[in-house]
Amino acid sequence: MAKEKFNRTKPHVNIGTIGHVDHGKTTLSAAISAVLSLKGLAEMKDYDNIDNAPEEKERGITIATSHIEYETENRHYAHVDCPGHADYVKNMITGAAQMDGAILVVSAADGPMPQTREHILLSRQVGVPHIVVFLNKQDMVDDQELLELVEVEVRELLSAYEFPGDDTPIVAGSALKALEEAKAGSVGEWGEKVLKLMAEVDAYIPTPVRDTEKSFLMPVEDVFSIAGRGTVVTGRIERGMVKVGDEVEIVGIRATQKTTVTGVEMFRKELDKGEAGDNVGVLLRGTKKEEVERGMVLCKPGSITPHKKFEGEIYVLSKEEGGRHTPFFTNYRPQFYVRTTDVTGSITLPEGVEMVMPGDNVKITVELINSIALELGTKFAIREGGRTVGAGVVSNIIE
C-alpha cells in the first residue's frame, strides 16, 4: 500500500520538548519520529540528526534549534528541540519557535531538577499555554512507589507555576527503549507508551486559533498621502483580516483614533480583503498623513491598548553574540524595538538583583517614554545605538 500523501487538511500544531539537560528530550524527539514512521506518519530522524541542530538567527540572536515534523491520525505537528539550556531560554523568549504546547520530559530516575523548574517558569512567563509530561527512563526505576513520588513532585511543580498540575496528563515510558524497538522495525510495549503520549498531546493541547481568525492587527511601517484618495498606511498584517468598510483604531504614541477602511491594496491592486501575512496598503477615511506614524498599529477597535509600563522576561546577549561587554544596572536606558519602532525606556531590576551580566536571563520592569500598543506576549528587542543587546517578551502589563 502506498503511503498516504501529506494531507493539508489536518490541523497544524506547534510543539516542542522541554526539560532538564540529559533527561532525554532529544531521545524522545527521535523516538516519536521513529515510532510514527512505522505507521507511515513521519520520517525517521536519528538522534544525531536532531542533536546537531542548525543555528538560526532570530532578532540578531543565534539559536541552535532542531525542527522535525510528523503526523498523528488527527494532526500535523511541527516539533522543536534545542540542544543546550541557553538555546531553550533564547528560543522561548524570542519566540523563534512559537509553541502551542510543550512536552516536559522528566527523568523518572532523577525527578525534577533545576532546569525542569526553569523551563516551567519560562513557559508560564512567555505564554506556552499547555504542558503534557513524559516521565522518561521508566526502565531504570524498579520501585513503583518511586515513580509515583516523582509524578506527585512534577504535579506540585506545575501547580506552583499556575499550570493545572492535577489535571496534566503524565505518561511514563522509556524513549531509548522505544527508539531501539522502532529501529528494529516494530512498535513494542515501549513504543505503545510513546503512542499513548501522542494521544494525550492530541487530546490535551487544543488546536490553536489560526492567525487569520484573531483580531485584526497591522503594525504601521509607512504612511503616504495620495491626491484625491486620502491617506494610505502600509505594513504587514500580523493577524486577523481587514476589508473595506471595517472600523479600525490607530493605537500608540498618541491618543487612540478611530477611522474606517476605504480601500485595501496589494501591489497596487484592489483586494477584497487583506489577511495575516499579507503586505498591504490600507486607505483610511478622513485621516491626515501627519496623524499616523511608524510605530503605531492599526487594529480591530478595543482589541489592543496603549501602555508604557510593563514587566518582561529578557535574555541579554553575551559578548560572543555581539552583545554588551559589561553588566547593566537599574535605570539602564536602552531602546525597546517593538514591531516597527524603537522607543526609549528605563529598566528596573527585581529586588535582590544588583546587576545583569551579558548572557543572563532576568525579569525586568520597563517604563517607556511613549505609550505603544502592548499585550501579554508582545516580543521586543533591546537595542543600544542600533545594535541588538537583548530580546524579551511582555509578561505583565502594569499601566
Curated annotation (Swiss-Prot):
Residues 81-84 are annotated as: G3. Residues 174-176 are annotated as: G5. Its main location: cytoplasm. One of its GO terms (molecular function) is GTPase activity. Residues 136-139 are annotated as: G4. CDD domains: EF_Tu, EFTU_II, EFTU_III. Mg(2+) binds at T26. Residues 10-209 form the tr-type G domain. GTP binds at residues 19-26, 81-85, 136-139. It comes from the Bacteria. Disulfide bonds: none annotated. Residues 60-64 are annotated as: G2. Keywords: Cytoplasm, Elongation factor, GTP-binding, Hydrolase, Magnesium, Metal-binding, Nucleotide-binding, Protein biosynthesis. It is an enzyme of class 3 (hydrolase). It is found in: Cytoplasm. InterPro entries: EF-Tu_GTP-bd, EF-Tu_GTPase, EFTu-like_2, EFTU_2, G_TR_CS, P-loop_NTPase, Small_GTP-bd, T_Tr_GTP-bd_dom. One of its GO terms (cellular component) is cytosol. PROSITE patterns: G_TR_1, G_TR_2. Residues 19-26 are annotated as: G1. Monomer. GTP hydrolase that promotes the GTP-dependent binding of aminoacyl-tRNA to the A-site of ribosomes during protein biosynthesis. Belongs to the TRAFAC class translation factor GTPase superfamily. Classic translation factor GTPase family. EF-Tu/EF-1A subfamily. This is Elongation factor Tu. It comes from Helicobacter acinonychis (strain Sheeba). The gene is tuf.
